[in-house]
């Protein structure tokens, strides 16, 4: 079983899930969003990926499986982020959106408390010093997803999730898959 929800119940605010390519990382993320929104643990969700193609693919999968969830892809700039419960973005787009996106009343839309849950896709790639500011800025539960084997993930990635190096919250690797 994925233990991150249990960890959140115990007070942890971060989880790193290491799962083999093709084993369903996005599906797990969708299930977690479903459970956390139904439990009223997460009202607004941010999904971050390092490439626009991953953002687009993830949004498509979320919309297919959670059709009642209002979504916005900041990379496409078509939907209104103010009325969307789930925002999809690349890291650079989100960095700009924090300062530039305004609510209808002219205030900053993406305040530190705006998101309750942040999902980082392929988090081993995304943990650059310049993007760590996003995780520090928002006060939200943080779930990282990666297919990189746990022994190949850098120590700085584990430290972002407050984990011991080599010990992710959950691992479902090639040997198991």
Label every model-predicted segment.
Residues 1-177:
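RecA-like P-loop NTPase motor core of helicase/translocase proteins
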